[in-house]
């Protein structure tokens, strides 16, 4: 669960964290017995625990298809991200990856830790892929082909303009949105969403990741990964790596805020996409990552720590998002709360303040007009959660132990 300090500071994180831990244990027990499927679901939980939990709620056939889709694209991403692979080797692999998924003898050793295991044992993913229905296989092959070609293009091309940035994000994430929409439609659970809305779902997530991961990407060895567009960062510094130096802190934060403001462009499309979903499990699967993204942007905005270390939502807040997100009203409430948090951090002296505030106010207007912002709802913004004395701490841990014992025996399927 979360760290002791974080739990004591945010005691209402206890119950969601407890439910999340129990759900994780339950998900691990549901791993299939067939070797290739056992590998795939075990690997899914290793590379993304939260994604692994949400995916478990989907229907069996769709769950299998989304699991394989995710692992195939993680493998493709592992090849792209490994800066030790020469361009001459990397580009042909990316271009041919959609054919490799049909070959259960193919593997390519690269990446580190669990990603290296995924690549070394890729035949398990291929075998599971071949088990899928034809509609699922066709959708996965098509997106893998297009993504591999797009990644190959940007191996040899820098992200210069905002149009380049949008194009790169389309290849690595917008296509994921298109692919998931195709899988949802193939399952019979949803109408086929437009490419434009599907693309925005992916771009919002990807741009958030690119913003949050600046320091990790710029410090990559043997070669930096640079995804922030020159058109934005060149307004503030001469070289992208200059943003991490303390003497450029003021300019770095202004550049960061410019990047966040750009990402906010996609929120209205994302809200429209989610409001059109009918299946409750698919809805949760799509909505939880989007809320995590707006929450992460709220943390990153105007925060110099993006250039100093890791900025991410605490585990307890993540658990709350997973626990509370069930309906579109919950989504509107979360986006309103996090946009309020972000708005409170806007400095009127920031060069993009007017643009940032305009985009946040447009998001807040949509949320207000939805009618979802009732006084009874639970807010993600709590003014004061500190000041608990030692007696209360002891009581809270007793309650925690009782809840854990109760939920372990009575709520194995809850999140």
UniProtKB/Swiss-Prot annotation:
One of its GO terms (biological process) is response to jasmonic acid. SUPFAM superfamilies: Terpenoid synthases. One of its GO terms (cellular component) is endoplasmic reticulum membrane. PANTHER family: FARNESYL-DIPHOSPHATE FARNESYLTRANSFERASE, SQUALENE SYNTHASE. Its cofactor is Mg(2+); Mn(2+). It comes from Panax ginseng (Korean ginseng). It is found in: Endoplasmic reticulum membrane. Component of the triterpene saponins (e.g. ginsenosides or panaxosides) and phytosterols biosynthetic pathways. Catalyzes the biosynthesis of squalene. Its main location: endoplasmic reticulum. It catalyses: 2 (2E,6E)-farnesyl diphosphate + NADH + H(+) = squalene + 2 diphosphate + NAD(+); 2 (2E,6E)-farnesyl diphosphate + NADPH + H(+) = squalene + 2 diphosphate + NADP(+). Pathway: Terpene metabolism; lanosterol biosynthesis; lanosterol from farnesyl diphosphate: step 1/3. This is Squalene synthase 2. Belongs to the phytoene/squalene synthase family. Its EC number is 2.5.1.21. GO terms for molecular function: squalene synthase [NAD(P)H] activity. It comes from the Eukaryota. Keywords: Endoplasmic reticulum, Isoprene biosynthesis, Membrane, Transferase, Transmembrane, Transmembrane helix. InterPro entries: Isoprenoid_synthase_dom_sf (IPR008949), Squ/phyt_synthse (IPR002060), Squal_synth-like (IPR006449), Squalene/phytoene_synthase_CS (IPR019845), Trans_IPPS_euk-type (IPR044844), Trans_IPPS_HH (IPR033904).
């Amino acid at each position: 669960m979360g760290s002791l300090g974080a739990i004591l500071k945010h005691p209402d994180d206890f119950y969601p964290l407890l439910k999340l831990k129990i759900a994780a244990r339950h998900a691990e027990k549901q791993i299939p017995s067939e070797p290739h499927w056992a590998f795939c679901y075990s690997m899914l939980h290793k590379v993304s625990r939260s994604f692994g939990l949400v995916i478990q709620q989907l229907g069996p056939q769709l769950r299998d298809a989304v699991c394989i889709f995710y692992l195939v694209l993680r493998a493709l991403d592992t090849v792209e991200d490994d800066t030790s692979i020469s361009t001459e080797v990397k580009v042909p692999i990316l271009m041919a990856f959609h054919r490799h998924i049909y070959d259960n003898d193919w593997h390519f050793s690269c990446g580190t830790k669990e990603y290296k295991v995924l690549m070394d044992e890729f035949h398990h993913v291929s075998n599971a892929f071949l088990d899928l229905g034809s509609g699922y296989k066709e959708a996965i092959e098509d997106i893998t082909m297009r993504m591999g070609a797009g990644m190959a293009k940007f191996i040899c091309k820098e992200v210069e303009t905002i149009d380049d940035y949008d194009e790169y994000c389309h290849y690595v994430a917008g296509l994921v949105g298109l692919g998931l929409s195709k899988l949802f439609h193939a399952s019979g659970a949803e109408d086929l969403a437009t490419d434009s809305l599907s693309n925005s779902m992916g771009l919002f997530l990807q741009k958030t990741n690119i913003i949050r991961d600046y320091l990790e990407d710029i410090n990559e060895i043997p070669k930096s990964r640079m995804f922030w567009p020159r058109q934005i960062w060149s307004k503030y510094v001469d070289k992208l790596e200059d943003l991490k130096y303390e003497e450029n802190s003021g300019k770095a934060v202004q550049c960061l805020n410019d990047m966040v403001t750009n990402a906010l462009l996609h929120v209205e499309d994302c809200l429209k996409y989610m409001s059109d979903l009918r299946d409750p499990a698919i809805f949760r699967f799509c909505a939880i990552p989007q809320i995590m993204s707006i929450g992460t942007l709220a943390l990153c905005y105007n925060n110099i720590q993006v250039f100093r270390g890791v900025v991410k939502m605490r585990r307890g807040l993540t658990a709350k998002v997973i626990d509370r997100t069930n309906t579109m009203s919950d989504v509107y409430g979360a986006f309103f709360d996090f946009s309020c948090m972000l708005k409170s951090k806007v400095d009127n002296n920031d060069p993009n303040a007017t643009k940032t505030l305009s985009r946040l106010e447009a998001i807040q207007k949509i949320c207000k007009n939805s009618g979802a912002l009732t006084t009874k709802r639970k807010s993600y913004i709590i003014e004061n959660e500190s000041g608990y004395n030692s007696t209360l701490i002891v009581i809270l841990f007793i309650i925690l132990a009782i809840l854990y014992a109760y939920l372990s025996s009575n709520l194995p399927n809850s999140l």
